[in-house]
């Protein structure tokens, strides 16, 4: 039965395409997990990843005389990158640090964000046009877009910069941010 499927040109192209999408999706997720320090989960995924990779590559190498298989392999690779990144966006692993500078001095904004469940550190900062409120907010990535919308609703002219912190240590941040539930 398998030999019949593999001898069908269209079926072979689809199998190679799907195998490479799966392989590269696993590869992308494994790399992201590795960068985020999830080494054991990354190692487990790499085991599945390599099995899929060897299967797909052997199908292509056994049929190198058929250019459509090579094209399917390359196309599957590109699509796998997109699929892997979409999966990672949905998983939203890790945390983000959001720095906000208000257009004007606004001591109420930090309070409003805290009431919504965000951990906020704030201070008065001097800008070219006068005093402003500067805020640092650490939140899980899954709340990133919600946080941006909240900030824009409370201060539509706020300056926002976000980045992923490499290391988080000390303070109430580590325990409190993990337990905190953001209110909508």
From Swiss-Prot:
Listed Pfam families: DUF2179, DUF5698
InterPro entries: DUF2179 (IPR019264), DUF5698 (IPR044035), UPF0316 (IPR022930)
Gene Ontology cellular component terms for the protein in this record: plasma membrane
Record organism: Bacillus subtilis (strain 168)
Major localisation: membrane
Name recorded for this polypeptide: UPF0316 protein YebE
HAMAP family given in the database record: UPF0316 (MF_01515)
The family this protein is said to belong to: Belongs to the UPF0316 family.
Keywords: Cell membrane, Membrane, Transmembrane, Transmembrane helix
Transmembrane segments: 9-29, 41-61, 67-87
Topology with respect to the bilayer: Multi-pass membrane protein
Gene: yebE
Localization terms from the record: Cell membrane
